[in-house]
Regions:
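Short helix-coil boundary/hinge micro-motifs
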Residues: 1-8, 35-38, 144, 160-173
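N-terminal cysteine/histidine-rich coordination modules
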Residues: 1-87, 92, 96
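Amphipathic alpha-helical transducer elements in NTP-driven molecular machines
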Residues: 29-36, 69, 130-133, 156-159, ...
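Signal for well-folded cores of large energy- and translation-related assemblies
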Residues: 44, 113, 121-125, 140-141, ...
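Short active-site oxyanion
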Residues: 70-71, 126-127, 145-147, 170-174, ...
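Extended interfacial segments that mediate partner engagement and assembly in macromolecular machines
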Residues: 79-151, 155-158
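Short basic, glycine-rich beta-strand/loop surfaces that mediate nucleic-acid
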Residues: 170-215
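Charge-patterned, long linear interaction tracts outside catalytic cores
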Residues: 224-235
């Protein structure tokens, strides 16, 4: 697999995995932070979702963080989304009337899932992906996996064997899930994919970030992260 460095989606780099860019030999830049409009907490942008208000007053999700206008930031958690909608917090943060879709939570979850699948497809085209039980085993042994993704409907036997190997060769390797084998397969141009290894670098970091945000939106209490550390929203 080819190792990929730099932001996976063309945006500014985040804080996960890697020491960050240095200028003039100084300290690595700290990850940008924003305040969540629901909790009031100041958090790294990696844990937040950006929204903007369109000229007609409608609320627009901006998960890619590229739309013009003042950003409204919300932690990527199901309870934060529910609170923001129920308490009219988008309008309060924007200091104007805001039209919020009734199905905003569903829309944002769909967009977050699409970002995960699209990024996985980009990683495949960049040569940063291996898929299949034997290929993933070989890549793990060679130290060529920065993120392990397993299908939500993977058989327990195969899942446990891959996780046992990951624990043995890379105890800190994140092991995540976010969809079934069929959806993984579509993103990778094949019928199905159960075990997927992502090369260390920008794609592994970007996918881990997006999958964790998606899990938070779904109210996930546990990811298949027996190998890596738990993250915000997995409580």
């Amino acid at each position: 697999m080819a190792r990929a460095d730099g932001p996976a989606d063309g945006s500014q780099g985040g804080s996960q995995g890697g020491s960050g860019h240095r200028r003039g030999g100084g300290r690595a830049a700290e990850a940008p932070q924003r305040r969540c409009l629901a909790s009031g907490r100041v958090l790294p942008k990696d844990q937040l979702l950006r929204f903007v208000v369109a000229p007609d007053g409608s609320l627009v999700p901006d998960l890619g963080e590229r739309l013009p206008g003042r950003g409204l930031w919300l932690q990527a958690r199901q309870d934060m989304m529910a609170a923001a909608c129920a308490k009219n917090l988008f309008a309060k943060a924007a200091k104007r009337q805001v039209r919020v879709p009734d199905d905003l939570a569903r829309q944002v979850e769909h967009l977050a899932l699409k970002r995960c699948l699209d990024l996985l497809g980009l990683a495949r085209r960049a040569g940063a992906v291996v898929a299949g039980f034997e290929k993933v085993k070989a890549a793990l042994r060679a130290g060529e996996v920065g993120l392990l993704i397993q299908a939500a409907d993977a058989a327990d036997d195969g899942r446990q064997k891959i996780q046992a190997l990951a624990r043995a060769v890379a105890p800190q390797l994140p092991v995540l899930q976010f969809c079934g084998a069929a959806e993984l397969g579509v993103a990778l141009g094949r019928e199905a994919a159960v075990h997927v290894g992502i090369a260390p670098g920008r794609f592994a970091e970007g996918l881990a970030r997006e999958i964790r945000r998606l899990a938070g939106l779904r109210g996930a209490t546990v990811q298949i992260n027996e190998v890596g550390r738990p993250t915000e929203g997995e409580r």
